[in-house]
């Protein structure tokens, strides 16, 4: 199914978590997408949807896991201009971002409106700090694409690592795929 969807979308870029993510759903989805990274170009696999002539670029979203190997960014993108809509979109997913429930603790998301608003604001600040941390942590990668001066002024960023199974773009191609 994933192979079919990528073909139907005629994707240029596919972004997924790395296969050593903390969450089982993330790990297994990553493996399925990795498998599709090869299969999207194989004509006799899922013959009901035409195989892609050009393999998409498959990217891993950044994380802080160190084992079995740490995240190694190949591209970093400023999200300064879209940080607010990015946070708004993430906060809509209450069950994923705000409710908690991990490790058996279900008390993070209060039922009363004032408490819910407070939790939403805490989650917003936490997510913003994460993206600010990426801008700081991957400043050198930002500089490769934006130049030193512009990179110094980036407040929020997202970084990505190339998946070894998809197309391996050059720096010039990455600059075309991501408008710097």
Listing of model-derived features with the role each one plays in the protein:
Residues 1-46, 52-54, 60, 71:
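Active-site beta-strand->loop->alpha-helix modules in alpha/beta enzyme cores, enriched
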Residues 43-47, 54, 65-69, 75-180:
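C-terminal accessory domains and tails appended to enzymatic cores
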């Amino acid at each position: 199914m994933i192979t079919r969807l990528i073909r139907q979308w005629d994707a240029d870029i596919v972004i997924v978590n790395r296969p050593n993510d903390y969450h089982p759903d993330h790990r297994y989805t990553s493996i399925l997408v990795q498998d599709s990274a090869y299969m999207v170009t194989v004509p006799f696999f899922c013959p009901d949807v035409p195989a892609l002539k050009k393999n998409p670029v498959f990217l891993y979203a950044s994380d802080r896991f160190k084992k079995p190997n740490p995240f190694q960014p190949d591209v970093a993108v400023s999200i300064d201009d879209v940080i607010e809509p990015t946070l708004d979109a993430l906060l809509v997913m209450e069950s994923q971002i705000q409710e908690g429930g991990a490790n058996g603790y279900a008390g993070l998301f209060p039922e009363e409106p004032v408490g819910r608003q407070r939790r939403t604001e805490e989650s917003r600040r936490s997510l913003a700090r994460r993206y600010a941390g990426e801008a700081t942590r991957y400043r050198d990668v930002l500089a490769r694409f934006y130049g030193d001066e512009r990179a110094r002024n980036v407040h929020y960023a997202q970084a990505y690592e190339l998946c070894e199974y998809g197309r391996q773009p050059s720096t010039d191609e990455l600059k075309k795929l991501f408008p710097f």
